[in-house]
Structures are given as C-alpha cells and as structure tokens.
A protein has these predicted regions:
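Ligand-binding loop in jelly-roll beta-barrel domains
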Residues: 82-106
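A structure-centric signal for secondary-structure junctions around beta-strands
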Residues: 31, 50, 94-95
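Short acidic-glycine-tyrosine-enriched beta hairpin
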Residues: 67-82
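Short, conserved beta-strand element in jelly-roll/cupin
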Residues: 48-63
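Short secondary-structure boundary/capping segments
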Residues: 24-26, 45-46, 53, 69-70, ...
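A short, N-terminal "cap"/entry segment at the start of jelly-roll beta-barrel domains
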Residues: 1-46
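Short strand-coil-strand connectors
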Residues: 30, 64-68, 91
C-alpha cells in the first residue's frame, strides 16, 4: 500500500459488500489483511493459513478455540493461530467482528 487508508467506521464497515456468512475486505497491505464480518458463520470455521485476530465490534456470543470456549462481547480481542480449529457460537443478531489476518501463510 502506498498510502494510509482513511479510518473505517463501524457504520461504514456494515455497508461494505459481502456475501452472507463471509467477511468483507477493508484493506490489504503486505502480510496484513483487515476484514469485517457482520454475523459471521455460527459454528466451526475452516482453519485459516495465517494467524488472526478478531476484535468484537458489537453483539455477544461464544468463541471456541479447539476445546476452550469463552463468552465474548464488544471490545474483546481474540487470537487464533494458523491451522487451529475455531469458531463463534450462539451469536446475537447484531454480532460483528473486525478480522485481522497477518504474517506469512503457514
């Protein structure tokens, strides 16, 4: 990226084009990919090829990483290493997360 992208508000992110259950691209720069997911898939996700961070923007639910489950809500920061089984469960209608994939594919 040859410039700094403008700030993206939650309202703007909610308006990004996406398909149901999938995240929308916010921006990509080298080994960093920022996405936004409103109502992500409820249940297991396919393990990803890169480490990732989730930042809960709105709503509530449960976050499972392998066999550990945590209640999550706005402001929570969640980590998942590449190739690890994870997913969201029992998410509210307004649940949304910022998703940051970073580092090389593993």
């Amino acid at each position: 990226m040859d410039h700094t992208p403008p700030p993206t508000s939650l309202a703007a992110a909610l308006g990004l084009p996406r398909t149901l259950g999938r995240s929308a691209e916010v921006f990509v720069d080298g080994d960093l990919e920022v996405r936004f997911a409103a109502r992500p898939t409820n249940g297991p996700q396919v393990p990803h090829l890169r480490d990732e961070l989730y930042f809960v923007a709105a709503g509530s639910g449960r976050y499972r990483v392998e066999d550990k489950v945590s209640d999550v809500g706005p402001g929570d920061l969640l980590f998942c290493a590449a190739h690890v089984a994870h997913g969201f469960e029992d998410i509210s209608e307004d649940f949304s997360v910022w998703v940051l994939f970073y580092g090389p594919r593993k």
